[in-house]
Amino acid sequence: MKTLLLTLVVVTIVCLDLGNSLICYVSREGQTQTCPEGMNLCEKYAVSYFHDGRYFFTYECTSTCHRGDRNVCCSTDLCNK
């Protein structure tokens, strides 16, 4: 009986965690992160520190997204590749 109860508790915890967690890419190399509470979007946005038109991308969990033609803003797991 204790085993059944423990199994139910573990399954409940896992299901609750999976239902509320968004996973986003946070690096070009493919590292991922479970987003903190309140961060319900994944984003990939272009950053330009160069004066010749070159840019690089930043990947993150966010609550609001940057505007831009090269940017990706989405709300499903691993959508910001």
Swiss-Prot record:
Q: In which tissues is it expressed?
A: Expressed by the venom gland.
Task: Quote the cellular component terms of the Gene Ontology held in the record.
Answer: extracellular region
Q: Where is the signal peptide?
A: 1-21
Compartments where located: Secreted
Listed A to Z, the keywords are:
Acetylcholine receptor inhibiting toxin, Disulfide bond, Ion channel impairing toxin, Neurotoxin, Postsynaptic neurotoxin, Secreted, Signal, Toxin
The molecular function terms in GO held by this entry are:
acetylcholine receptor inhibitor activity; ion channel regulator activity; toxin activity
Q: List the disulfide bonds.
A: 24-42, 35-61, 65-73, 74-79
UniProt similarity note:
Belongs to the three-finger toxin family. Short-chain subfamily.
Q: Sum up the protein's function in the record's words.
A: Snake venom neurotoxin that blocks neuromuscular transmission, presenting a postsynaptic action through the nicotinic acetylcholine receptor (nAChR). Has no cytotoxic activity.
Protein name, as recorded: Mipartoxin-2
**From which source organism is this entry?**
Micrurus mipartitus (Red-tailed coral snake)
* Organism phylogeny: Eukaryota, Metazoa, Chordata, Craniata, Vertebrata
